[in-house]
Every structure is written in C-alpha cells, then in structure tokens.
Swiss-Prot record:
It catalyses: Hydrolysis of proteins to small peptides in the presence of ATP and magnesium. alpha-casein is the usual test substrate. In the absence of ATP, only oligopeptides shorter than five residues are hydrolyzed (such as succinyl-Leu-Tyr-|-NHMec, and Leu-Tyr-Leu-|-Tyr-Trp, in which cleavage of the -Tyr-|-Leu- and -Tyr-|-Trp bonds also occurs). The active site is at S106 (nucleophile), H131. Pfam families: CLP_protease (PF00574). SUPFAM superfamilies: ClpP/crotonase. This is ATP-dependent Clp protease proteolytic subunit. It comes from Acidovorax sp. (strain JS42). It is an enzyme of class 3 (hydrolase). GO terms for cellular component: cytoplasm; endopeptidase Clp complex.
C-alpha cells in the first residue's frame, strides 16, 4: 500500500457550515455529535470507551430528555472497556437507541443489545455474533488460577445481562455463547438482541 493510500485511510471528512458570521468547519463525527449521533467503529478498547463515555455524558448534559443514537460497527474487544460504555448507557437519563451498521460482534453485540428496549435496530445486511469471554492469562499457576476465576465470574455476569436484555433463558445464552454464534439481522431480531430490522428511515 502506498503512503498516499495509507494517508487516505486515515482521513476524516470535514463538513463546512455557513452562517451569518462566516464559515465553520467540523470533522464529520463532531458534526454528527451535534445531531446526538455517536459512532463506535472498530475495536472496543480503553481509548474508544473513554471517547464514547465522554460523548454520552456530554449529550446528557446538553439535553437529558432527548434520545441519543449509537451506531455500532465493531468486532468487539476489551470487556472492561465495554462495560464502562454499558454502565454509562444505563446510568444516563436519555434513552440510547442502538443501530448495527455492518458488524457487531462480541462486546459490539453486547452493546447493541444494551440499547433502550424498543429502540434497538439493525440494518438488513448486518451481521451479529455473540461468544464467551476470551482470556489470555500468563504467569505463575496461582496467578492463572486467579484470572480464571475472574473470567468465569465475568462470563456469568455477561450471560446474565444478555439474558435480561434479550429475554432468552439464561441456559440458552450460556449454550449459545460457548462458541462463536453468528446471526443475520433477522435472526438477531428473533433472538432479542435488536427490536427491528430497518432498511430505510421511517
């Protein structure tokens, strides 16, 4: 890949607005934030979680009674980072409407299901995947044992929340998350991860 192509991949479109006082340029994500739209694109990690949490809190302070739209296209990532987003979504006053555009896997699917009931959507050709928590403990046997216990506790916690959010029996969620469980948008609706599959805006 050429240097030019690499640079182009990192480019963020700018939007220019004109007013009586002149012109002002925004990056596209800042402009959409003005419309109460937040994007989660790519891996869930501490950096992306901090950005999403900050945007959620900012939009709540702007208007605690107006919904926030949360667009997700993510393969998942860190459980602790994802739980920071999840807890903030439940903590703030505005309803958070979620929409999968592309792929929502692992923590991405978990956050998709975390939206306000009745306001969780998927575009028709999106894919959703759930699975169990991944661990990568190394070190002394005692340390590995401590991490293993924590992973099992986290797995139980996430399965319980997913069961509550989807309406599925906990035993079914446990069985389905043992391995990668892929769903189409319609299958995710049947499962209870989303409430509606939409092809066009209402």
């Amino acid at each position: 890949m050429s240097a030019l192509e690499t640079q182009a991949l990192g480019m963020i479109p700018m939007v220019i607005e004109q007013s009586g006082r002149g012109e002002r340029s925004y990056d596209i994500y800042s402009r959409l934030l003005k419309e109460r739209v937040i994007f989660l694109v790519g891996e869930v990690n501490d950096q992306t979680a901090n950005l999403v949490v900050a945007q959620l809190l900012f939009l709540e302070s702007e208007n605690p009674d107006k919904d926030i739209s949360f667009y997700i296209n993510s393969p998942g990532g860190s459980v602790t980072a994802g739980m920071a987003i999840y807890d903030t979504m439940q903590f703030i006053k505005p309803d958070v409407s979620t929409l999968c555009c592309g792929f929502a896997a692992s923590m991405g699917a978990f956050l998709l299901a975390a939206g306000a009931k009745g306001k969780r959507y998927s575009l028709p050709n999106s894919k959703i995947m759930i699975h169990q928590v991944l661990g990568g403990a190394r070190g002394q046997a005692t340390d590995i044992e401590i991490h293993a216990r924590d992973i099992l506790r986290t797995k139980e916690q996430m399965n319980r929340i997913l069961a509550e959010r989807t309406g599925q029996p906990i035993e079914k969620v446990k069985a389905d998350t043992e391995r990668d469980y892929f769903m189409t948008a319609d299958e995710a609706k049947d499962y209870g991860i989303v409430d509606q599959v939409i092809a066009k805006r209402p």
